Amino acid sequence: MAARVAMLAPFAPPSVRGNAVTVARIARGLTERGVPLRVWDLSVRPEATVAAEVEAYRPALVHAFHAHRAGRLALALARRLEIPLVVTFTGTDANHDLFDAERAPAVRRVLEGAARLTVFHASIGDRVAAVLPDLRARLVVVPQSVGLVAHEPLDLRARWPLPSGVVAFLLPAAIRPVKDPMLPLAPLERLSTRFPEIRMIYAGPLLDPGVGEALLRRLASLPWARHIGTVPHAQMASLLAQSDVVLNCSLSEGGMANSVLEALAAGRAVLASDIEGNRSLVENGVTGVLFRDEAEFEVRAAELAGDPGLRERLGQAGRELVARDYPLSREIDGYRDVYRALIPVPA
């Protein structure tokens, strides 16, 4: 029997959160390469149930996506079953949990118990190694890729009938504080007098009640902006195709945002916050545009709204970047090589 892999994730499809999208893409790619695996979604099953099912599955390796949310159970299972543990370190892990007084001890125990630790970008690995230098030899960089494989059409007009000729700014993100969803509204409101064709689209679940309610209250008075709800990932390519500028306003990212990668792959112009995770993908003025604050957002948004040629040039450069540097095959090869160093896997 081929060596099996048990994947533990804080979220999995049909969730459209970044972790779920990443896990689904990697699991699909590894399965296509002949790696037997099963994914457990910790958001829908009790830990005791997951533990019993994983033990019955008899895996040769446990792979946890998210050190804090999935790593603790994965570490306990790896020790109980005497098998290696692989941990994929996420944005929340790197930017918050590793330094949080309450969560850091548990996160560090998980990292120290892992046979391999994967990160999406070298900068995240450097951050981990600065805190836990003994882990550097176990760190492996596996860059993310794009998995827009299902192209179901999205009837945007059914959610928000838009006139022709609009310039659609899209924020595809779960509504929570780290995504800073309120940031675009004031600058775009000021620009809407110069560019009445501007429309602002929010697409994603309302995960934080406080932020979600504040956003909906604000949108109620803005006829040019709307939250269209959660869009299934299978329809994301269609939504991107109906947008002109894709926003990422995050305060932090775990190396590479799925939303930015997908926007680049779709040939959309990207306007993103100037943070480490976004800089790993967006070369300012080449593959997208970066902003440092609300004032700079307004300047860059005006440039993009008024210059379709600029949007086209940025989109084409982004599409070429993803095709050249972030193919799906490299991501899947990376995880397969990590596994191969620990257990027998198909060539």
Language-model segment annotations:
Residues 230-231, 239-243:
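Short alpha-helical donor nucleotide-sugar binding micro-motif in glycosyltransferases
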Residues 283-295, 303-309:
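Conserved acidic donor-binding segment of nucleotide-sugar-dependent glycosyltransferases
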Residues 213-234:
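Nucleotide-activated donor-binding/catalytic signature segment of Leloir-type glycosyltransferases, i.e.
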Residues 118, 162-179, 185-192, 201-203:
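Conserved donor-binding/catalytic core segment of Leloir-type glycosyltransferases
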Residues 44, 146, 199-213, 229-230:
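Glycosyltransferase donor-sugar binding loop
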Residues 114-139, 143-149:
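A short, active-site helix/loop in glycosyltransferases that binds the activated sugar's phosphate group
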Residues 150-162:
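A short helix/loop element that forms part of the nucleotide-sugar donor recognition site in Leloir-type
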Residues 269-272:
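Short hydrophobic beta-strand element within catalytic cores of glycosyltransferases
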